[in-house]
Amino acid sequence: PSTVTLNPGPANGSLLPPYFIPVEWGQRFGLPLSEWIVVPALWIGITVGAIGLVIAWRAVTDGWRPRIHLMFYLGVALNMLTAIVPPLTSADVLMYAAYGRLQRLGMNPYDITPAEIFRQAYDPVLVWTERPWQDTPSVYGPIASWSQWLANVLGGESMHDIVFWLQMMAVIPFIVICTVMIKLAHGDAALQTRSVLFTILNPLLIWAVVAGAHNEALTLVFAIIALWFVRKSPFVTGIFIGLAGAVKVSLVFYGLALVWGYRHDWRKVLQLGIGALIPIGILYGVFAPQALFAASRNTGYVSGGSWAPWMRSALAWVLPDAAHGITAALGWIGLFVIGWMLSRVLPWRAVPGAQLPAERDPLTIAVRTAVILCTAWIVTSPYTLSWYDLIVWAPLALLVPTRLDWLMALRGVALSVAYVTGRTVGFSDVMVNVVAFTIRDVISSGVQWFVLIAIIHWFWTTNRQWPTAAFIRNGFGQLLVTADRPQPKRSPLRPWRRPGVAGPR
């Protein structure tokens, strides 16, 4: 344990991970290392990893086709090794454990905070939580809460063992996501390679999701499985997207993408809706009605490193009382504006296996729309973090290479580096008030503004179309119109490649 490595508590003889050098042993060898060593080392590691990712996907564009199974197994090994050491730089996993502990004690984590308990009496699990979220009730959906309860059941009264089970609940869904993405890209070696590179071999996601033990993969895995069933059964697709929404409400964007994909056939929209309502109605309506409203607590936050601090600070000079509200409103407006712009510039390419043109294939439409909506959300939300990017990286793998790949990598590097000092304990005043402030609130926020400006420039110079009245009328006229019948004969889709570059032989 150090300033960047969580202390999950003593193992007390447990043979389970996470494995680490006990504090008393480390002191004999001069451990933990100074913050001025470990923090820059992580900055360098994250940056080098991102550069490696860019080199790899450029190689794919130039014709590199590695053996997918070897790539996949390498990714599995790297992620499992990452998951057996203590989580790094974020104490969120300790809060997951705390919410599960409250449930084991018979309390409601949506009403009671961990601090309300451990300030009154000693608790072997809650005592290991860290600021600043100890006074915050849960904002997670019922499935996420169930996973937190299950980790407590398996881990008993040991925070160490509970953290291990929560790490497994982060890494296993992450691996499943990659597996499904490879299946979705079947028959196209380039897309399959991108699917591995953009998920379990993506250093930015290994760092943000697995090293931080965040529950983003548990959130997304149901939505990705829903994509697998799009061409098979709208009802089953609805079941899985409903389960995704029961982990985190933010998966509503995937739900909207699926509705948009099926919009030409009202019967499929109806089946999708019925399927989604079953898990949502049961899990939210019967087991955890408060969870649906708890998620709204996140909408009022502003995170360091996003575009919002600059805007809020500027507005505070002239409208101090309204600055926060105006910033939040601009985020919502930006969601629609950036979403529209991305819809005009992202190219169409049918997901492998399509029997209809790309613009009419429900899976292709859903994947492209998910990328558009989720990208628009993460780049315009006043509260945005690097592990949120998983919901964009996964479907982005099925699109042709565009400048959005670069923008996602740039954004991910900035936010990941910014939150190396994300914990609120253990750092010196100079590190927090000077270095961390500069990295997070100056450099990272500047990068987020650059990403927004780059998307606007992309739209302005590529396909500057605005939603005219005729466009809107035509769009409404196409809603719920039965889709074209599959064409009986189509030439097989060929893997994309850069013009003038020979493909694999």
Which sequence ranges carry the predicted segments?
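Loop-to-helix entry region of an early transmembrane alpha helix in multi-pass inner-membrane enzymes
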Residues: P40, P142, W146, G156-V176, ...
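Transmembrane helical bundles and short interhelical boundary loops of multi-pass, membrane-embedded
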Residues: P1-L42, I280-C374, L399-R505
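Intramembrane catalytic core of multi-pass membrane enzymes that act on lipidic substrates
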Residues: W64-Q167
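Transmembrane-helix motifs of polytopic, lipid-linked glycan transferases
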Residues: V48-R58, D161-D188, F336-R344
